[in-house]
Amino acid sequence: MPIITLPDGSQRQFDNSVSTMDVALSIGPGLAKATIAGRVNGQRVDACDLIEEDASLEIITTKDEVDGLEIVRHSCAHLLGHALKQLYPNAKMAIGPTIDNGFYYDIDLEESLTQEDLEKIEARMKALAKTKYQVIKKKVSWQEARDAFEARGETYKMEILDENVSRDDRPGLYHHEEYIDMCRGPHVPNMSFCQHFTLLNVAGAYWRGNSDNKMLQRIYGTAFHDKKALKDHLTRLEEAAKRDHRKIGKQLDLFHMQQEAPGMVFWHHNGWSVFRDLEVFIREKLTEYGYQEVKGPLMMDRVLWERSGHWDKYADAMFTTSSENREYAIKPMNCPGHVQIFNQGLKSYRDLPLRMAEFGSCHRNEPSGALHGIMRVRGFTQDDAHIFCTESQIQDEVTNCIKMVYDTYQTFGFDNIAVKLSTRPEQRVGSDEIWDQSEEALKQALESMDIAYEIQEGEGAFYGPKIEFTLFDCLGRAWQCGTVQLDFNLPNRLGATYVGENNERLVPVMIHRAILGSLERFIGILIEEYAGFFPTWLAPEQAVIMNITDKQADYVQEIAQKLQKCGIRAKADLRNEKIGFKIREHTLKRVPFMLVCGDQEMEAGEIAVRTRKGNDLGKFKVDDFVSYIQDQIASRKLNLEE
C-alpha cells in the first residue's frame, strides 16, 4: 500500500501499485487531463509507470516549462518518426533526441529531402496529432526489442541495442499506432499534448558524429505548449536569421571561410580591425588587473602533453605532426605552456600571485559537422590566463577574476549573466580540506559581490571546482563564455613549485581564467547581438565623408585626412553618385557616422552629420566633430540607439 507524498506535503495512500496518472485522477479530472508525466523521488517517469513503494511525487503538467516542454518535444520527435515511416517506408530511423529549443531526428534515406518535403512531412505530423492517439509504452526484454526492430529493418536501432544496451535491460518501446520507437522516456500519454510544432530545416549529420560513418539527414523541429509561444519563437528565429553572423560578415566584408581550410577563418581587413580592437581592449584590462602577457609555442612535443594528461583525454582532438623521429601536437589549449614559463627560475611565495595571460592561437580537430561560421571553428584565439597563487590567496584572486569578467561584459552591454558554481565530483584529486577551502572561497567571492549563482553539485572537474558565466543576448540565447577554474592537478603533474615562508617547496594552486573564451566566437556573438551595428570604437569604418558635387571634393579629402590623423577610421566617398544613393549604401555598411558636405557646409567650415540609424545630428565644426567622435571611441560608448 504505497503512500504518495505530494509537493505540498500532503499524503495519499493507495491499496495497490499506482501510476502518476492514477494519482492525478484521484485529485481531479482537470489535473489528469493536463498530466504529461511524473517525477518520482526526483526521477522522471512516464505517467503510466507504476509506483510500488512509498515515494514523493511531482506531477509534470503543461505548466512545466522545463521538463514538461522537453517531454513534449521528445514526443514530437517520435511523431516525426511516425510521419516519416508512413511517407517514406524505406527510411531507416537512427536517433531523435531533444536539443535546446527543439528536437531532431536523424534518418537514413536515399533521396535528399527538400523544404517542400518538410512541409509535406509536417502536414502528415499534424494530421496524426489531430487524432490525439494514445502513446502505449511497453517494457520488453532486450531480445524482444531487437526482434521488433529486425523485423522492421531498423539497422540503426539494432546497432544501438547491440552496442549500448545491456542484455539484462528491459528497453522501453513506445507504440505510436503502427510505429514503434525505443527510448528511456518519459513521453506524453497521448498526442493531445503535441499540437504546436513545426519543422525547421534539414542538414547532414554523420552517424554517431563520426566522419568515417555514413552521412544521414537530420531533420530539425521545435514544439511548444501553445500557439503563441511557438509563434514568438519563430519570430525570434526570423530575427536571428537576419542577424546571422555569416550573412552580416559577408555583407560587411569581415571574413570568409572556405573548403580548403575547414574551421579556419580568413579575416578580411574590416574583420581584422574588429579583432585587433578587441585585443587592445583586453590588453588594457590585463594591465588594469595586474596581468603579464606571455606567448607560448604553437607546437610542443607529445611527451609534454602526456605528462600534462592531455594526451589521454584530448588526443583525438589534437592536430599532430612529426619531425626527426619526434611527434608533436599543435596546442589545443595554453595551460601546459604557461606552467613551463612559471617553471623557469626559482619562485618564492613573495612572487605570488603570478597572473599570466596570452592571446593563444589554439587548434582543435572539431568534427566537420559541428563547424559553424566563426562560432565553432578549428583554429581560434583564446583570451586565456592562468594565475599561480597560494591556497590563502584563492578567494582574493577569484574575486579579482569575477570583477574583471563583469567589467568586461558591461562594456559590450551584456548585463544578463547567469552564474553556475560546479562542486566536487566523486572522482577527484586533492584533499577534502583543499576542496572545502576552495569551494568556500568561490562561494565567498560570489557572495561578496552580491552575485546570485546556481550550485551544480558534483559537476566540477576532477582537478578543481569552477565558476561558469553565461551571457544572454538580445534574443534570449545563452552563450557560455567565461570560466574561473581551480586546478590542483596540472601544477603538480608538471612540477610547478615555489618556496614557502618556511623555506619548504610547495605546489601552487592554478586558476584557469577565460572571459571572452574564443575571440572568434565572441566576435560572432557581437555581430549577432549588434546586428552588425558595432559601437563606434569597434566599427571597421567609423565615419565616411561624402560630397554632393565635385566642387566639394578637395574639402572632403581635407576632412578625411584630418580625421585619419586623429586616429579615426574615416574615408572619403567622392564617387559621382547621388547623395541619397551614397547614404543608403553606407547605411547598409553600418558606418556609424555619415558626414555630408555641400556648398553651405564648405563655406562655413562645417559638416552635416547623420547616423546610420537615420538620426540628423545637425551641423558641426570639423574640430567639434573630431572631439565628439573621439569621446565616443575613447569611452567605448555603446551608442547603439544613436
Curated annotation (Swiss-Prot):
<feature type="binding site">
    <location>
        <position position="512"/>
    </location>
    <ligand>
        <name>Zn(2+)</name>
    </ligand>
</feature>
<feature type="region of interest" description="Catalytic">
    <location>
        <begin position="244"/>
        <end position="535"/>
    </location>
</feature>
<dbReference type="GO" id="GO:0006435">
    <property type="term" value="P:threonyl-tRNA aminoacylation"/>
</dbReference>
<keyword id="KW-0648">Protein biosynthesis</keyword>
<protein>
    <recommendedName>
        <fullName>Threonine--tRNA ligase</fullName>
        <ecNumber>6.1.1.3</ecNumber>
    </recommendedName>
</protein>
<keyword id="KW-0820">tRNA-binding</keyword>
<dbReference type="InterPro" id="IPR018163">
    <property type="entry name" value="Thr/Ala-tRNA-synth_IIc_edit"/>
</dbReference>
<comment type="function">
    <text>Catalyzes the attachment of threonine to tRNA(Thr) in a two-step reaction: L-threonine is first activated by ATP to form Thr-AMP and then transferred to the acceptor end of tRNA(Thr). Also edits incorrectly charged L-seryl-tRNA(Thr).</text>
</comment>
<feature type="binding site">
    <location>
        <position position="386"/>
    </location>
    <ligand>
        <name>Zn(2+)</name>
    </ligand>
</feature>
<dbReference type="InterPro" id="IPR004154">
    <property type="entry name" value="Anticodon-bd"/>
</dbReference>
<dbReference type="InterPro" id="IPR004095">
    <property type="entry name" value="TGS"/>
</dbReference>
<dbReference type="InterPro" id="IPR045864">
    <property type="entry name" value="aa-tRNA-synth_II/BPL/LPL"/>
</dbReference>
<comment type="similarity">
    <text>Belongs to the class-II aminoacyl-tRNA synthetase family.</text>
</comment>
<dbReference type="InterPro" id="IPR012676">
    <property type="entry name" value="TGS-like"/>
</dbReference>
<keyword id="KW-0547">Nucleotide-binding</keyword>
<keyword id="KW-0479">Metal-binding</keyword>
<dbReference type="Pfam" id="PF00587">
    <property type="entry name" value="tRNA-synt_2b"/>
</dbReference>
<dbReference type="InterPro" id="IPR012675">
    <property type="entry name" value="Beta-grasp_dom_sf"/>
</dbReference>
<dbReference type="InterPro" id="IPR012947">
    <property type="entry name" value="tRNA_SAD"/>
</dbReference>
<dbReference type="GO" id="GO:0000049">
    <property type="term" value="F:tRNA binding"/>
</dbReference>
<dbReference type="InterPro" id="IPR047246">
    <property type="entry name" value="ThrRS_anticodon"/>
</dbReference>
<keyword id="KW-0862">Zinc</keyword>
<keyword id="KW-0030">Aminoacyl-tRNA synthetase</keyword>
<dbReference type="InterPro" id="IPR033728">
    <property type="entry name" value="ThrRS_core"/>
</dbReference>
<dbReference type="InterPro" id="IPR002314">
    <property type="entry name" value="aa-tRNA-synt_IIb"/>
</dbReference>
<keyword id="KW-0963">Cytoplasm</keyword>
<dbReference type="Pfam" id="PF07973">
    <property type="entry name" value="tRNA_SAD"/>
</dbReference>
<keyword id="KW-0694">RNA-binding</keyword>
<keyword id="KW-0067">ATP-binding</keyword>
<feature type="binding site">
    <location>
        <position position="335"/>
    </location>
    <ligand>
        <name>Zn(2+)</name>
    </ligand>
</feature>
<dbReference type="GO" id="GO:0005829">
    <property type="term" value="C:cytosol"/>
</dbReference>
<feature type="domain" description="TGS">
    <location>
        <begin position="1"/>
        <end position="61"/>
    </location>
</feature>
<dbReference type="GO" id="GO:0004829">
    <property type="term" value="F:threonine-tRNA ligase activity"/>
</dbReference>
<dbReference type="GO" id="GO:0005524">
    <property type="term" value="F:ATP binding"/>
</dbReference>
<dbReference type="InterPro" id="IPR006195">
    <property type="entry name" value="aa-tRNA-synth_II"/>
</dbReference>
<dbReference type="InterPro" id="IPR002320">
    <property type="entry name" value="Thr-tRNA-ligase_IIa"/>
</dbReference>
<dbReference type="Pfam" id="PF02824">
    <property type="entry name" value="TGS"/>
</dbReference>
<dbReference type="Pfam" id="PF03129">
    <property type="entry name" value="HGTP_anticodon"/>
</dbReference>
<comment type="subunit">
    <text>Homodimer.</text>
</comment>
<keyword id="KW-0436">Ligase</keyword>
<dbReference type="GO" id="GO:0046872">
    <property type="term" value="F:metal ion binding"/>
</dbReference>
<dbReference type="InterPro" id="IPR036621">
    <property type="entry name" value="Anticodon-bd_dom_sf"/>
</dbReference>
